[in-house]
């Protein structure tokens, strides 16, 4: 999957508890074996991942083009933004004023959305042992973040429906 010898060496270590070819542990690593079903799915995905990325980027472009003139929305940067961003758009997460109202509106129209981490910044998860710290930019972001539908099964008409519904909400 790589033509970089250093990356290949590191991946080799990571895949088996950080052990090198002699079995000596030389770095941190994992051991995550695939069962036959997972391996079969991965074999298929390795054949389609380039077209999957292309489709995800196409969906993201549709969202960006259809929503870019709405001042109440801040879109994620595109891969062309800085020349080094390689976003494959696993998610299409934007910032939206009146996020909760927008989410309810979309839900009433049959459009599912996700609020990352249930709208709670990770540093606020007390059960993880974090102190009570203030991160105002992070906290502001989490009050507005919203993920739009982004999957390989969604078609262009459905994307257009999401876009037109958001446009209707913001009038």
Q: What kind of feature is each model-predicted range?
A:
Residues 3-171:
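PLP-dependent aminotransferase class I/II
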């Amino acid at each position: 999957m790589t033509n970089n010898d250093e990356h290949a060496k590191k991946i080799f270590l990571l895949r088996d508890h950080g052990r090198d070819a002699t079995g000596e542990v030389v770095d941190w690593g994992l051991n995550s074996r695939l069962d036959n079903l997972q391996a079969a799915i991965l074999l298929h995905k390795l054949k389609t991942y380039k077209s999957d990325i292309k489709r995800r980027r196409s969906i993201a472009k549709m969202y960006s083009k259809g929503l870019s003139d709405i001042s109440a929305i801040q879109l994620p940067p595109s891969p062309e933004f800085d020349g080094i961003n390689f976003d494959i758009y696993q998610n299409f997460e934007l910032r939206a004023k009146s996020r909760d109202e927008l989410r309810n509106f979309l839900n009433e129209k049959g459009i599912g959305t996700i609020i990352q981490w249930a709208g709670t910044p990770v540093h606020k998860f007390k059960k993880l042992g974090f102190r009570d710290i203030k991160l105002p930019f992070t906290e502001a972001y989490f009050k507005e973040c919203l993920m739009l539908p982004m999957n390989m099964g969604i078609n262009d008409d459905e994307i257009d429906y999401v876009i037109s519904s958001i446009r209707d909400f913001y009038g």
